[in-house]
A protein has these predicted regions:
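N-terminal beta1-alpha1-beta2 module of alpha/beta enzyme domains
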Residues: 1-70, 172, 200-201, 266, ...
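Residues at secondary-structure transition points
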Residues: 55-58, 62, 134, 179, ...
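Internal, glycine-rich beta/alpha segment that forms the wall or movable "lid"
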Residues: 46-51, 78, 84-191, 204-213, ...
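Acidic (Asp/Glu)-rich catalytic clusters
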Residues: 31-32, 64-73, 95, 99-105, ...
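Hydrophobic faces of well-ordered beta-strands that scaffold small-molecule active sites
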Residues: 3-7, 38-40, 75-78, 106-110, ...
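Short, acidic/polar
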Residues: 17-30, 91-95, 177-190, 236-249
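An alpha-helical appendage that flanks or caps ligand/catalytic pockets
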Residues: 7, 31, 36, 122, ...
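Active-site mouth loops of central-metabolism enzymes
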Residues: 7-21, 81-89, 130, 170-180, ...
Length: 287
């Protein structure tokens, strides 16, 4: 079983001037602790679950590029990018650049997008849910085309590209976040290398739905990495964290991505190092 760290907050003692140093400590700490992955949210305003809207929030791909320069092992991705916030060609180029500069460690984490206040606040496109899913699917199609030898036009309902040239070439894994049964999990089965659920989802049921989509499409279910995001609260012991991860592995989760109260704290990184070591011996169900 794999362990990842997400950094959803950039609020540290010392204010804005402390962000670079503390985020660097989190990135280096995750890399040195034996974690598999490092993630940031792709938000422009802080979201309600993690703080006040006015709290500091870094742009995802700038932050990930900074982390890439400080690390050598962890994979790097946004958990997850709202597909409607960037033109698909630009997004694919950003992730391809991250992949090139990190030595092949980028992941495209993507979803339909949901946080309307930041979109309205910054004047970004925020169409209906149905259209956001249409744009997400077209973005996935464009990514696959740009990460192939098909240097040709793309024409969809919402996006038209005259030439899907992408050099340097890349093929980062695609992770789709969300648990919607009719649309999201169908897109996972058709386009993705990994899925991501939030803690609290009915994992057993959702994985059954995903398996059914895979069977219908002729996709091997085992090809897809199953990931889940959860929080580790203050005071939780390593043994308790191991138990939680083990319970998820028994359901078929391959990779747990955790948020901790302070991703740069020595105590948090020590907890994660111990957790990563212990769960590395766990084989998820179906593997």
């Amino acid at each position: 079983m794999k362990l990842g760290l997400t950094c959803p907050r950039f609020t540290w003692p010392g204010g804005d001037s402390a962000i670079a140093g503390r985020f660097a400590a989190a990135a280096r700490g995750a890399d040195g602790a034996g974690l598999h992955s490092l993630w940031v949210m792709d938000h422009f305003f802080q979201i309600p679950n993690f703080g006040a809207v006015e709290d500091p929030m870094l742009e995802a791909y700038g932050a990930l590029s900074y982390a890439a320069a400080l690390t050598s092992r962890v994979t790097l991705g946004a958990l997850v990018t709202g597909a409607v916030h960037r033109e698909p060609g630009l997004l694919v180029k950003q992730v391809s650049t991250l992949d090139a500069l990190s030595g092949g460690r980028a992941v495209l984490g993507i979803g339909a997008g949901w946080y309307e206040p930041e979109a309205r606040g910054l004047g970004l496109r925020f169409p209906s849910l149905a259209e956001r899913f249409e744009r997400l699917e077209e973005t996935l199609q464009i990514a696959r085309q740009m990460w192939s030898d098909e240097d040709k036009p793309y024409e969809g309902r919402h996006y038209r590209l005259e030439r899907t040239l992408n050099a340097p070439q890349a093929r980062p894994p695609i992770l789709i976040g969300g648990s919607g049964e009719n649309k999201t999990l169908r897109l996972v089965a058709e386009y993705a290398d990994a899925c991501n659920f939030l803690h609290g989802a009915d994992v057993r049921h959702k994985l059954g739905v995903l398996r059914a989509h895979c069977e219908r499409l002729g996709r091997p279910y085992e090809e897809i990495e199953k990931t889940l995001h959860m929080r580790i609260p203050d005071g939780q012991s390593v043994a308790e964290s191991v138990q939680r991860c083990g319970d998820l592995a028994a359901l078929g989760i391959d990779h747990v991505i955790v948020a901790v109260p302070d991703a740069a704290a020595d105590s948090s990184l020590a907890h994660l190092a111990a957790l990563a070591t212990q769960i590395s011996a766990i084989t998820p169900a179906g593997r």
